[in-house]
Amino acid sequence: MITNKIKIFLISLIFISGVYALQVDAPQYQPNVIHPGDDVDLWIKITNDNYDNEVKNIVVEVSPHYPFELRQVNPIKGKATISHLNPGESDTVYFKLHVDENAPSRDYEIDVKVSYDEINKEDGKETIHHYEITKIYYLHVYGIASFEINGNFSLIPSKTQTVPIEIINTGTGTAKEVNLYIGYSLNSVNAGSESVEVSAYGTTKTQEKTIYYPTAVPISNLPISPVGETKFYLGALKPDNSRVINLKLYTASNLVEGCYQIPAVITWIDEDGTKRAEQITIGAYVKGDILLGISNVVTDPKEIKPGTTYVRIDVTITNNGHAEAKDVKLKLITNKPFKDSWSNCNIKDVGNLLPGVSKTVSFYVDVDKYASAKHYKLPIEISYLDTANNKYKTEKFIDIYVKPKPLFEIITKEVNVTAGKENTVYITIKNVGSEKAERVKISAIRNSGQPFDYPIKSDTIGTLYPNQTGTGVIVIDVDKNAESKPYIITIEIRCAGDSDEGDNNVYVYQEPLKVVVNNSNSKSYWILGIIVVIAIVLVVGYVFKRKNSKDKE
């Protein structure tokens, strides 16, 4: 394609003579470089080349093709007239055109038709000859590049991600030497201005042109910033062509969910050689993540031991993410040796948690008295909805330490005592707990409703290690009228914790002991004696009767 020149094709329609009296010059126009959307001033010079004859009734018609449109309407749209031209005389006609804004780069046709009458005077006689000339001219329109950036991606705070973006030339001209700067601003340095006088067929225009040098300047501390490469060379981009590049971006940790703009600068050279630059932005959607964490686990009492009931466990749930968590629910799942202190006491409805917000909830558990001393991982089930009402469920664990303590079991299942006397009773106990017991002491607790007194009701056993047994002695004085039957008395076991482990607590337990009373004077013994006598009489009578029967035979 030939640029900056006009290609002229002459198509002539000769009606009367093959010799033209008029010369039609190539059109002159402003601006010299035509772009889509421009208004173009067009001048056409007509000269009477016949130095013998006058020409009259000159009509110049312009018929533009796409993308040109006539704007000149006086006196008739697209038509200009010259009344006459003497031999050698010339005149200029003026037209105004508009270029369609979406015209791509190429040469476009303009048809110029000139009709006139030539006056031929010979031998005093005037003869009129009519002529029509059609010429085709091509004006070049330089398209202008324009850019659009597409990137369908989302980012997550505190993360570095590689995302693709597409750069599209949506303009009408080819862009050369295209460069893309990510995380830059456009700083145009004004270098002054210049005045340019443009003349065409005696018409002079003065144009003021500002001179500036576009410069891409990097921006620091961006909420979304490029990592590594920030400048990308794309080469030439024709209209409707595109390039895809991969950006590595870091998203700041303090960003909340929403839309953000990444500044960028794109530079290129248009088809007419003009250097251009544009400040653009890349739209990015930061999708906040939801990170629910459990912290600040506090128990009451602070020291949890086997057999403790109504232990309160306070936990703090925090949304460490960047998006709101909705309808948050917590459920403490208890397994042996733990159980809920009451129904539904360990299901908590927290509600909504905004980013960075915390809430504290309380759970209540009972600890089995035979629980082993160790660390336990109690699961907490967390359910919630995200901003799009999608359901999620996760599980966190809290650490609960059950400390050791002594625990006792009476090995002696029952003792036999005699009514009306003092009975020395040996009671064996075992430390079935997980901690050494110091200063172990047993005591019988007197019950006024029972026929017992305790001349010696207590005895010190000493120290018992876990799984070790010890025996203590008490004396039970049984009332002489006590009935012969089993009784259940209460034995109190008192001890101190393991001082070597810093446990100075005093532990008190009460365990039952079966005491069987034997009383020969009691009504039960009389009844038993009568039954025995009757049984003996019956047996003797039966034997005697059989013996007499045999003697008679």
UniProtKB/Swiss-Prot annotation:
Question: Mind telling me which PANTHER family this protein's record contains?
Answer: NPCBM-ASSOCIATED, NEW3 DOMAIN OF ALPHA-GALACTOSIDASE (PTHR35902:SF3), S-LAYER DOMAIN-LIKE PROTEIN-RELATED (PTHR35902)
Any signal peptide, and if so, which residues? Answer: none
A cellular component term from Gene Ontology for this protein is:
plasma membrane
The name of this protein is Uncharacterized protein MJ1561
Q: How does it sit in the membrane?
A: Multi-pass membrane protein
Give the subcellular location.
Answer: Cell membrane
Q: Which organism is it from?
A: Methanocaldococcus jannaschii (strain ATCC 43067 / DSM 2661 / JAL-1 / JCM 10045 / NBRC 100440) (Methanococcus jannaschii)
Which keywords accompany this UniProt record? Cell membrane, Membrane, Transmembrane, Transmembrane helix
For this chain, the family text in UniProt reads: To M.jannaschii MJ0795 and MJ1506.
Q: Where are its TM segments located? A: 6-26, 524-544
